[in-house]
UniProtKB/Swiss-Prot annotation:
Superkingdom per UniProt: Eukaryota
Coiled coil regions, renumbered to chain: 935-962
Tissue: Detected in all tissues tested. Present in embryo, embryonic stem cells, bladder, skeletal muscle, bladder, uterus, testis, stomach, colon, ileum, trachea, lung, aorta, kidney, spleen, liver and vas deferens (at protein level). Highly expressed in testis.
Pathway(s) annotated for this protein in UniProt: Protein modification; protein ubiquitination
Cell location: Cytoplasm, Cytoskeleton, Microtubule organizing center, Centrosome, Centriolar satellite; Cytoplasm; Cell membrane
SUPFAM superfamilies: Ankyrin repeat, Mib/herc2 domain-like, RING/U-box
Principal location listed in the UniProt entry: cytoplasm
Taxonomic source organism: Mus musculus
Known function: E3 ubiquitin-protein ligase that mediates ubiquitination of Delta receptors, which act as ligands of Notch proteins. Positively regulates the Delta-mediated Notch signaling by ubiquitinating the intracellular domain of Delta, leading to endocytosis of Delta receptors. Involved in ubiquitination of centriolar satellite CEP131, CEP290 and PCM1 proteins and hence inhibits primary cilium formation in proliferating cells. Mediates 'Lys-63'-linked polyubiquitination of TBK1, which probably participates in kinase activation.
Protein name per Swiss-Prot or TrEMBL: E3 ubiquitin-protein ligase MIB1
Domain MIB/HERC2: 6-74, 143-221
Subunit structure: Interacts with CEP131 and PCM1.
Reaction(s) the record says it catalyses: S-ubiquitinyl-[E2 ubiquitin-conjugating enzyme]-L-cysteine + [acceptor protein]-L-lysine = [E2 ubiquitin-conjugating enzyme]-L-cysteine + N(6)-ubiquitinyl-[acceptor protein]-L-lysine
Length: 1006
């Protein structure tokens, strides 16, 4: 039976659109929460292969642990015959069927259900496949919605893993825009995307049909929102799973004492007076939230959220089985007992004869659970069920009894021990238990009364917690003051090693921390995970508690068991406000965690630009930006490796990071960016002045890497076209011709080739050889690309990089002055930020990228007459401000720009801005290629920055080693507080000059 079900899931699941599931532990492989993928195939009943819309393909678990949820199974073609969506009229419903539990015969398809059609207060049954068990869901009004992202209308895409449509897209790497999600076939809805390619072509492509993925998104789009917890888990027979073993529809009781329940409810929905009905009434599990807390509905119609540890599952006990437990008697029902009505229609009709008889209106009660309201003299039962009352034969119902066993789940042992302790305490009636409960509830009078009794232990525990800890977490300051007067142990630990100050940080109780500090509590105390209260406050996002702890002298840089400091945690939680507070308090940015990442590394790895901006703005020492990990990676290496462009820009421009640092493999950040084909990072590093000819441990330069990657991609394309291993030796010449031909087929379309050309155009050496004696050109079998590289390099050497344009710009002044688009009007529009002039004002709005340098056009300024003489048109570009407001004669007299008052460092002639060569000093030219304007000054700027860093580093070393009092002698005496001076100054002092603590002992350094 299990095998047939597994086979069915495997067949029916292929093509389903999925999102991450409840047991997901694979980081951002999918692109992040809400990103969508396609089930490609099943490796086994336990493993499924998914291709995410971002192109990542991997195996995931679908048995035992469940990594995926089904967002839409319509592409699989599963249909529910005889049904119709009552909103969009789809007939039959294909995919998941959503049936209203409160309306008669009302169904929705997946799109309409997640699109909030029908009443949001109504609960629905989810029917995943025809004939499968229907699952009752929480109403959508109370459920969490998240946004789906991936290949939807508006997404930018390239060809994907299953592409087989030749060059419809214009060639590998060409992009297109998804205009609509459509049906590949009538039996497979939502399984294709209609794409308009940049070359003008448009067509329909598979996204889910038979598990195929013709597309990969490079820029995802929103696909509407969906109810995450309502989506079925892929591979699971019953979607209502829960670590506590409870499922939607289960009957549950509360068998614990009121005070214990109230204690366990902290952090799990809390307790209100209206919940007293739950102590004597059996409820039905109607939902399981994202924190695995249980939502229970009661006969009154109320719904309450519970900690799973509070609830006991009620099992069905047949009357015959119960009778065996009695001594020769039959099962005796009592008023208030829960009973389940017999499922068998024919049997119950027979049993009801002479016992109230059978009525067709009783049909909905079959299999339902009700409560005994009255027991008649003939033993017949009056049962309240389904909102009405009926008389039943005792033999037609089964008694429902609570199970006596402990809760069984993954963390069951821990919960069982907790409950056992609670029961033991309950039975003993210990005063310590009453004290803890009173402290937790803020009952000052009761606490005062209990503390007067001689046999109470102020440090006694209940459920592993002391009164001090309970009061701290709940913010009961008055009780804390009472306990402190009784010499309570403020450092007492619970089972997790948490002290009262940890509990206060967890509960966001700044006032409690202040009281504990006055009571001499250790604010740097660590629990069993080596976390300080500051760690906990940062992780919970309690900014005021963080500030309070730091104000009272809490150490800002202690490490937990994983080596993370509060800085690491603030970066992970994306709390820039907390990060800034920690840095202002002197948190150490250089401390590394167990993986070797300091705070800068961590922010670069996470791709968190806002955190990086805060870190760089508050760095105590600028050279920290170049700190290496054990493997030699700096923060810039990590940003380049992971294509975090914004982070890399901050490191380069704000942090002045050294661009040429090498890791243990002697690779620079540029090596890594080229190797991973991260074009934007490559452009950023080259323009910032990264050296292009640094060799790694194999002697390879970035240009070697680019050409090797290009050649390998060409070979892979060749292998897709024919089986290379079977080519006969006689065909060898034609094979070489084919390899060469691939280069001419689309060299400029491939990012590796374009990166290689970009490097060559910016001066990369074509002749440098690696340790195998290979030059970059030796790694390129494509003669067309070799010629292009040589041409780019030659143009760079001859200073004509600007002539690398499709139009082959002539230096003829008339040609340079005419608009490159219409050729009718003269050029009169300045593009920013590149500073080129390529079009007239009429054509400029249509230009998105500069026609000379291919940079994105961010601003367009029409060139007016000279603001000084008003006789001629403005013809000189001022740098660095980028304004053109004066003619050649007037511009030569200016020291500052008349428009913005910025100092003029360079003057660029009009002809140079148009892409031509000026007859003036080359130092005044603006490059028309992809080279920064200030190329000449770059080396001097870098040298000055390096000298400044060294000066600051020397000053920092002096501050650490010199006596802070006299500033003349070396520090060679240390006090017990940790500070120090020189011996001469130290011998004359009675208190530390830094912290003002009394000097108890002086220790000389040797």
């Amino acid at each position: 039976m299990s095998n047939s079900r597994n086979n069915r899931v495997m067949v029916e699941g292929v093509g389903a659109r999925v999102v991450r599931g409840p047991d997901w532990k694979w980081g951002k492989q999918d692109g992040g929460e809400g990103h969508v993928g396609t089930v490609r195939s099943f490796e086994s009943p336990e493993e499924v292969v998914v291709v995410w819309d971002n192109g990542t393909a991997a195996n995931y678990r679908c048995s035992g642990a469940y990594d995926l949820r089904i967002l839409d199974s319509a592409p699989t073609g599963i249909k529910h015959d005889g049904t119709m969506c009552d909103t969009c009229r789809q007939q039959p419903i294909i995919g998941i069927r959503w049936k209203c539990a409160e309306c008669t015969n009302y169904d929705l398809c997946t799109v309409c259900y997640h699109g909030d059609k029908h009443h949001l207060r109504h609960r629905f049954y989810r029917i995943t496949t025809p004939g499968s068990e229907r699952v009752l869901l929480e109403s959508r009004r109370k459920s969490k919605k998240i946004t789906a992202r991936g290949i939807f209308a508006g997404a930018r895409v390239v060809r994907g893993v299953d592409w087989q449509w030749e060059d419809q897209d214009g060639g590998n790497g060409r992009r297109g825009k998804v205009t609509e999600i459509q049906d590949w076939s009538a039996s497979s809805p939502h399984s294709a995307a209609y794409v308009l390619w940049d070359n003008g072509a448009k067509n329909l492509y598979r996204v889910g049909f038979e598990g195929m993925s013709d597309l990969k998104c490079v820029q995802d789009a929103k696909g509407g929102s969906f109810y995450r917890d309502h989506c079925p888990v892929l591979g699971e027979q019953n979607g209502n799973r829960n670590p506590g073993g409870l499922q939607i529809g289960d009957l549950v009781n509360i068998d614990l004492d009121l005070e214990i329940v109230q204690s366990l409810q902290h952090g799990h929905g809390g307790w209100t007076d209206g919940m007293f009905e739950t102590l004597t009434t059996t409820g039905t599990v109607c939902g399981i939230d994202e924190d695995h807390d249980i939502v229970v509905q009661y006969p009154s119609g109320n719904r309450w959220t519970f900690n799973p540890a509070v609830l006991t599952k009620a099992n069905i006990v047949r009357s015959g089985d119960a009778a065996q437990g009695a001594e020769g008697g039959t099962s005796q029902f009592q008023v208030g007992d829960l009973v389940q009505v017999c499922y068998d229609l024919e049997r119950i009709k027979l049993l009801q004869r002479g016992h109230g008889e059978w009525a067709e209106a009783m049909l909905p009660t079959l299999g339902k659970v009700g409560r005994v309201q009255q027991i008649y003299s003939d033993s017949d039962l009056k049962v309240e069920v389904c909102g009405t009352s009926w008389t039943y034969n005792p033999a037609a119902v089964s008694k429902v009894a609570p199970a006596g066993s402990a809760i069984s789940n993954a963390s069951g042992e821990r919960l069982s021990q907790l409950l056992k302790k609670l029961f033991e305490t309950q039975e003993s009636g210990d005063l310590n238990e009453e004290l803890v409960k009173a402290a937790a509830n803020g009952d000052v009078a009761k606490v005062e009364d209990l503390l007067k009794r001689p046999d109470v232990d102020v440090n006694g525990q209940c459920a592993g917690h002391t009164a001090m800890q309970a009061a701290s977490q709940n913010g009961h300051v008055d009780i804390l003051k009472l306990l402190l007067k009784q010499n309570v142990d403020v450092e007492a630990e619970d089972k997790d090693g948490d002290r009262a100050v940890h509990h206060a940080a967890f509960g966001d109780e700044g006032a409690v921390i202040e009281v504990l500090h006055r009571g001499s509590a250790d604010l740097n105390a660590r629990n069993k995970r080596r976390q300080t209260p500051l760690h906990i406050a940062v992780n919970k996002g309690h900014l005021q508690v963080v500030k309070t702890l730091l104000d009272f002298g809490c150490h800002p840089s202690l490490q937990d068991s994983e080596g993370d400091t509060p800085l690491h945690d603030a970066i992970s939680k994306k709390r820039d406000d907390i990060l800034a507070v920690l840095l202002e308090a002197g948190a150490d940015v250089t401390i590394t965690n167990n993986n070797g990442f300091n705070a800068l590394h961590h922010a670069a790895l996470r791709g968190n630009p806002s955190a990086m901006r805060v870190l760089l703005s508050k760095l105590p020492r600028p050279w920290i930006v170049d700190e290496k990990k054990d493997d030699g990676y700096t923060a810039l290496h990590l940003a380049a490796l992971n294509n975090h462009v914004e982070v890399a820009e901050l490191l380069v421009h704000q942090g002045n990071a050294n661009l040429d640092i090498q890791n243990v493999n002697q690779q620079t950040a540029l090596h890594l960016a080229v190797e991973r084909q991260h074009t934007q990072i490559v452009r950023l590093l080259v323009r910032a002045g990264a050296k292009l000819d640094i060799q790694d441990k194999d002697g390879d330069t970035p240009l070697h890497e680019a050409l090797r990657h290009h050649t390998l991609s060409q070979l892979r394309q060749l292998q897709d076209m024919q089986d290379v291993g079977k080519v006969d030796a006689a065909w060898e010449p034609s094979k070489n011709t084919l390899i060469m031909g691939l280069g001419t087929q689309g060299a400029e379309k491939k990012s590796a080739a374009s990166i290689a050309c970009f490097l060559a155009a910016n001066g990369a050496d074509l002749s440098i050889r690696n340790k195998k004696g290979q030059s970059p050109l030796d790694l390129c079998p494509d003669p067309s690309l070799c010629k292009a590289l040589a041409k780019c390099h030659k143009e760079k050497v001859s200073g004509q990089v600007g002539s690398r344009s499709p139009s082959m710009i002539s230096n003829d002044s008339e040609t340079l002055e005419e608009c490159m688009v219409c050729s009718d009007m003269k050029r009169d529009t300045l593009f920013g930020p590149c500073g080129h002039i390529a079009t007239c004002s009429l054509c400029s709005p249509r230009v998105k990228k500069c026609l000379i340098c291919k940079e994105q056009v961010q601003s367009r300024t029409k060139i007016e007459e000279c603001v000084v003489c008003s006789d001629k048109k403005a013809a000189v570009l001022f740098q660095p401000c980028g304004h053109m407001c004066a003619c050649e004669n007037c511009a030569s007299l200016m020291k500052k720009c008349v428009q913005c008052r910025a100092v003029v460092e360079r003057r660029v002639p009009f002809i140079t801005c148009c892409g031509g060569k000026s007859s003036e000093d080359p130092s005044d030219e603006i490059s028309s290629g992809n080279i920064p304007v200030l190329q000449k000054d770059k080396d001097n700027t870098n040298v000055n920055a390096d000298v400044q860093k060294l000066q600051q580093q020397l000053q920092d070393i002096k501050e650490q080693t010199m006596c802070p009092v006299c500033l003349d002698r070396l520090k060679n005496m240390i006090f017990l507080c940790g500070h120090g001076t020189c011996q001469l100054c130290g011998d004359r002092m009675s208190e530390c000059p830094i912290c003002r603590k009394a000097i108890e002992r002086r220790i000389l350094l040797y």
